[in-house]
Amino acid sequence: MPVITLPDGSQRHYDHPVSPMDVALDIGPGLAKATIAGRVNGELVDASDLIENDATLAIITAKDEEGLEIIRHSCAHLLGHAIKQLWPHTKMAIGPVVDNGFYYDVDLDRTLTQEDVEALEKRMHELAEKNYDVIKKKVSWHDARETFVKRGETYKVAILDENIAHDDKPGLYHHEEYVDMCRGPHVPNMRFCHHFKLMKTAGAYWRGDSNNKMLQRIYGTAWADKKALNAYLQRLEEAAKRDHRKIGKQLDLYHMQEEAPGMVFWHNDGWTIFRELEVFVRSKLKEYQYQEVKGPFMMDRVLWEKTGHWDNYKDAMFTTSSENREYCIKPMNCPGHVQIFNQGLKSYRDLPLRMAEFGSCHRNEPSGALHGLMRVRGFTQDDAHIFCTEEQIRDEVNACIRMVYDMYSTFGFEKIVVKLSTRPDKRIGSDEMWDRAEADLAVALEENNIPFEYQLGEGAFYGPKIEFTLYDCLDRAWQCGTVQLDFSLPSRLSASYVGEDNERKVPVMIHRAILGSMERFIGILTEEFAGFFPTWLAPVQVVVMNITDSQSEYVNELTQKLQNAGIRVKADLRNEKIGFKIREHTLRRVPYMLVCGDKEVEAGKVAVRTRRGKDLGSLDVNDVIEKLQQEIRSRSLQQLEE
């Protein structure tokens, strides 16, 4: 009979099989009431599942990350329960958990309207408030199939036929009269599923195949309590205000159009931000001793066959033909950098060789996945590749890590999650090589006092990698930086150097990206700053305004002086009220507005106002210029007097 070992090391002895709920009740009624599921020997199980042998057990509650995921999964079943009551002929497909919520794909003979979604959410609340028990039954494959055939659930039958072994015992979850199929676990009672909201609908092909029927996907969010739900909805509201697509239009940064899907038309102000970002990256390339190169954006298909990209990536590559040759528009820069490395004989004395490029890349992303600047088809990578010896890996990775944190801190990103992906089952190279490579990455992180977590088996077949995910002011995750070791591509493309022993050797290649896609990073910055770019990045840094025509000459002189000082400035001499001008430029998020009236002209000064509405008073012109230059030069995130 089972001996149950709890997380604190204490043990409970039973003379009969017990469930996690039984053990929780044995510990106390409060814990039993909070129990959602159990983790038995490291595996999540339903609260009602029996434990027959000695085992470790952790009780899962809504406070646990797994508990919240289970709540969300059960809310998907609740959605199914409600939709079958409102529209009984609906056929249910799949209803998984996603970030912050869940969705269900349904086959319905009507297009759901906003009113339908509101009615569906209302019915879900009515059902959840009944606090009914969710009953799990393990049945044979044949019984499960018969159940869904009788109910007309053709998609569930297809899942059984195509994805579940005949000797398996699927779990059927009974929500009163509604039955769904799932591996589970699920909540034991619907009292855990009170805090949710349906968010939107979208189209989705069955099994993601455009040859199949288009279903309707209903998205929802679910949380453990009302406070967490409201906080999430507030974050979404704030995110909508910060949407880079909306701000990009307001500030006239860029546009996109149907004739060039996923391609950016940069307007003057947006391109100014892009170029300033390039200047910043170039300053770091110089500091960390990179050479900058530029490769062709199109190369013969034969080269991509050698690299392995054609076999593994061709669906995402654009191609074109000329003079009976097929060319691929590059989706990445690395093969081109190896071609540059291969020009001329290289010695071990030439290594490490650090090669960077603002590479114009194109990938044939599905049209439905395109999203403003965040997901595009044409983009610019701040890409670099380091050619080095195995002995140099640790030092080079160390420098890459310092560069990543150096650059992210400039933008105020402080929360960065780091993951180290290790060897997959299918890989090249010896175990000794992988041991050393993984150790080099881990030690480099440790030497920089950077906490990280392992992603076991998630590395590429050609080498382990470090991923850097930064979190913005809304606590959204953006995976931007990578440091990837590559033991394959240099060999495939015949890269070599002459070692100290006069023998030819293959260099190790380190792929390094920090911002990732320049376009995407500008989208991230637009939302992070809500369009209030720090002065050094702002397209227009200063606007000089007159109050009446009598100050026009002074405004022009001051504007010229600011331009000569390297400041991006505009003069606004329109015959409008000064309050109107200030409001307009405040909405344009111009960092500084300099107002010139008769008093300022007479004193040789200027009234300084920030876009946040702070009046800095009447200041000496040369002092203002000096302070602005210092703020811009230091790439400060703070404005004057902040």
Curated annotation (Swiss-Prot):
Which cofactors go with this protein?
Zn(2+)
Annotated signal sequence range: none
How many cofactors are bound and how?
Answer: Binds 1 zinc ion per subunit.
Q: Where in the cell is it found?
A: Cytoplasm
Which SMART domains is this protein grouped with? tRNA_SAD
Please give the SUPFAM superfamilies that the UniProt record associates with this protein: Class II aaRS ABD-related, Class II aaRS and biotin synthetases, TGS-like, ThrRS/AlaRS common domain
Principal subcellular localisation of the protein: cytoplasm
Q: Choose any GO biological process term that the UniProt entry carries and state it.
A: threonyl-tRNA aminoacylation
- A molecular function GO annotation: metal ion binding
Q: Does the keyword Metal-binding apply?
A: yes
Keyword entries, A-Z: Aminoacyl-tRNA synthetase, ATP-binding, Cytoplasm, Ligase, Metal-binding, Nucleotide-binding, Protein biosynthesis, RNA-binding, tRNA-binding, Zinc
Q: Which reaction does it catalyse?
A: tRNA(Thr) + L-threonine + ATP = L-threonyl-tRNA(Thr) + AMP + diphosphate + H(+)
List the residue ranges of the region (Catalytic). 243-534
Q: EC number(s) for this protein?
A: 6.1.1.3
Function of the molecule: Catalyzes the attachment of threonine to tRNA(Thr) in a two-step reaction: L-threonine is first activated by ATP to form Thr-AMP and then transferred to the acceptor end of tRNA(Thr). Also edits incorrectly charged L-seryl-tRNA(Thr).
Q: Which family does it belong to?
A: Belongs to the class-II aminoacyl-tRNA synthetase family.
NCBIfam families hit by this protein: thrS (TIGR00418)
Q: Which PANTHER family match?
A: THREONINE--TRNA LIGASE, CHLOROPLASTIC_MITOCHONDRIAL 2, THREONINE-TRNA LIGASE
Q: What name appears for this protein in its UniProt entry? A: Threonine--tRNA ligase
Q: Record the organism.
A: Salmonella paratyphi B (strain ATCC BAA-1250 / SPB7)
- What gene name does this entry carry? thrS
